[in-house]
Amino acid sequence: FQTTMTDFWTAIQELSKDPSSSVTQGMLVQRAAEFVQRAGAVYSGLSSYQNNLNTQIKQNVDKINKYGNQLLTLNDQIRAIESGGIEHANDLRDARNQILDELAELTNMTFSEDRYGSVSVQIEGVDFVKDGTCYEIALKTDEATGFYTPFWPQNATYTVRADGTRDYNIDGAEVFDLSVEISSDLNTDIGGLKAMLLARGDHRANYTDLAEGKYDSVSQSVVMNIQGEFDQMIHNVVTKVNDILAKAAGVQTGDLELADGTKLENARYCTVDPDGYMRMEDGSPIQLFTKVTTDGYEKVSVKEADGSLKDYWVMKKEDPDSPESLYTIGNLQVNPALTKEPSKLGFRLADGSEDKETADALKAAFTEEAYTLNPNVQKKTTFVDYYTDLVSQVSNSGYVFRSIYENQVTTVEATQSAREQVIGVSTDEELSNMIKFQNAYNASSRYINVISEMLDHILSTLGV
C-alpha cells in the first residue's frame, strides 16, 4: 500500500506542474482509483483476520464444552473406583488433571475437589461443572458481522421465535467482561479465549471509532485499532481532496432556510450552475471520490430574502449512526464520470488560465502536518508519512507484545518444572528405585536360600 500511496502523491505533484494537461488529469484519476482499490484490499485483509479469529473462538468454545462433559465422565469413574476407600484411580486423575490444565490455558478458571473425589469448575467466577452438570457455554451470533459472543444460557433471558428457536438477550450473561481494564495486577489478562475476543473486537471499526469518548471501545483490540487508524487515513485524504475541489467550485459555508421552513446551520452549499467551473452536468460540484451508496450533494429549494425560491446544492453531512453517509473504505469509489472522462476536471478557469491555485492546494494538503494516528498520540503527521507511522506503531506494539509473550513462556516453563518436581515422574529417580529394589530382592532371595538349606540340613541330620 505504501507504493500506492506514493504513486498517488506523485500524480498530484505532476498535476501541480501542468494542471490543464489531460495526461496529468488522467494519471490523477487512475492513481486515485488504485488508491481506493488497494485500501479496500488492506481493509479486507484485516477483516479476514477478524473472521479467522472468530472461527478459532467457536472452535475453542466447542473444545471447552467438550472438556466439561469429559470432566463429568471422569468424575463418575473416579468416584466409582475410589468409593471403597481402597483403590486410587491414578490414571483417571492424571487424565482429569490434563483437562484442567487445558481449561486453564483457555480461561480464567478455578476448581475444587469434594470428599468423594469429584471436581467442580468455575470459569470467570461462574459455575461450569458442578453437581453432575456441565453448564455449557453458548454463542450469540451478531447478524451484521457474524461475530460470536460467548454467554451463559442459564443467566440470559430469551423469547421464543415463531419457528420455536430461542432469541437470547445476553446482557449481563456474557462469559467475559471486555469493558474492564486488561492488567496483570487485576488478574484480567488470563485465558487464550479472552485474548482472541479482545484481538478480534466486536465489530468492523472505521474512523468514527477514533473520536473522543469512543476510542476506549477499540483501543484494546489490535485489529480494530488498526482498522480505525487506517480508515481514518483514507477518510482524511478523501475528504481533504474533495474539500479543495469544492472550494474551487464555489462551495461556501453558511445558514440556509429551506422552502418548508427547515433551517440548516453551517451548511456547505453552492448554486446550481451546470456551466460553472468544477461542476458536473447537473450543476453539482465535482468530487474526485464519491460514496457508493449515497450522493455527496443534495439539491434543495431555499427561500431567498425576497421570498422567492432558488435551488442550491447542499453537501450531505456525515452521520456516525448512518454508515451509508460516511466516506469510509467500504463505501468509497472514484467518481464514475471522471473515470470515463478525467478531463472533466479541467483545471482551467473561466478566463482560460490554468487553476494553479487548486493544484497547489492539493499538493500542499499532502505535506501539511495536521493529523494524528489516534487521540492518545500527540505527534502530528502528514498524509505522506501517516502510513509509515501506522506501520511503525504496529511493529513496535508487536515487539512489545512478543517480549511479554516470551517472558510469560519462561515463567510458565519454570512453574511447570517446579510442579513436575512435586507431582511428576523422574526417570533417574525411578531407575534408582528399581536398582535398589532389585538388589533388595536379590539379598532377600539369598537369605531365604540359606535358611532353606539350613532347615534341609537339620531335618536330614535329625532324620538320620
Per-region residue spans from a language model:
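Structural signature of extracellular appendage/secretion-system components
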Residues: 1-464
